Amino acid sequence: MKKVIDCLKENNPVIQKKLREVSVEEGMEIARELFEILSERKDGIGLAANQIGYDAAVAVVNVREPLILINPVIKEQWDEIDYYEGCLSYPKKGVHTKRYKNVVIHTEQEESDWYFSGTEISTEGKGTWEEQNKKQDQELRILESVCVQHEIDHLNGISCIDKAVDTTIRRTEKKWGRNEIVGITDGKDYKEIKYKKAKPLLDSGKWEIYIGGPIT
């Protein structure tokens, strides 16, 4: 079985290449291998063919359900959001990016388009449990939408490293209460603590406010 090529240590000649289109049959075969690698690693939610050295426009996503993307094309995207994501090809190199909450794509093996949306879905339920459940569902939908965009970028020779944005100004705009719970990350670990306890870590430059995102 092939492995994900660590681009920080090894050369990957196809990681920055726009990949060739493939037949559905070839795409399905590659997708099976990609899912096997994800299943064995257990540390990713998406994978593109060029991450393991194949010149083939095929990727898989597994957030809410397993999805296969063969020669995918983004047709529409809207509602830009800030995100924080990582990549199996660039371990421990999380970056802030700009993504879209909603995206419509077309894949080779399906006649109809696929619509991924992080827009909150209204429910009849009320109360703490219902609100938490609704929030978790929305977060998963956004994660799935971003992961799809991340993998399609890979197939066009673009990684999240290429899309990294400077967040210096954005971070200073937000004022946090001393007792407000914030999520912070050092690119590897994640923790939720009160801002007054997080501030020394943030000031050290080794930790930053976590926006949330996939490692794919």
Pin down the residues of each PLM region.
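Positively charged
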Residues: 1-181, 185-192, 196-206, 211-216
